Amino acid sequence: MAGKRTVLTVRLRRLAAMLHEMREHAGLSKEVVSAKTGINVTTLYRIETAQARPQRRTLTAMLDLYGIAEPQRSDALQLLVDALRPGMARSFEDAVSEVYGAYINFEAEALSARFFQSTYMPGLLQTEEYALAVYQTTMPKISDQVIEQRIRARQERAGVLAKDDPLELWVVLDEAVIRRLVGGREVMVQQFSRLLDNTEKRNVILQILPFDAGAHPGMLGSFTLLDFPDPADPELVYVEGIASDELIEGHPEVRRYGVMFDQLRAMALSPRDSINMIQEAVRALES
């Protein structure tokens, strides 16, 4: 996955949305813009969908054609400058998928994250030993070097929970996550200790969805919802799959996931009862 690929960031997505809106407001089709500026129609599509980052001269030509004056013009040019800055995923691009790299960048700038996990602990809360056990089991063919980079990425991601304006994290775990022995008893005890330590933070809420809750909306799989501090940046959903990952945008789809999460947290144990369940699991492992 090495190379000069464009990894999505919050600012690149914002610039793409801005340029699409400007073109629509100017009443111009992509074909007309292409004819007047010489910018390929495919390139315009990629720029407006944040799949490509425009060069400054390309952006200037678009702004000129759309008749964009100050302060919007400076805002767009500044977004391009900001979009050139490497995101958190820059250090790990060779070890992660393009979509996951984009997710890491989004997570680093998010205001809040809502996780539902049905199979294993959220990456933000994993210990190094737990993460190693997960990767060795789920991705047995990847190299030790890639595994090491991925684990380092997860450990560095956790910094969003401790910065001055920390990420607000709400996690709902299926009970299966705490019952499944990953890496052995010692690894699980350490992992539970990490979980419990994080529940003491004011910005972290953890709930367990018990087996006796029965059928639930999350049975189709895990997902993450990200919200951002700027209203110009719409919330999105990250879904991790076996063959590929997916970032979902668009109000109707994202709203459905939001409703699902609300249903799951309503069905889950209270944070206090969830902590009690984890503490009981620790005692069972240590006995």
Residue ranges and their predicted role:
Residues 165, 172, 182-287:
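C-terminal regulatory/effector modules of DNA-binding transcriptional regulators
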Residues 2-21, 25, 30-35, 49-179, ...:
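Interdomain hinge/linker segments and adjacent boundary elements that couple functional modules
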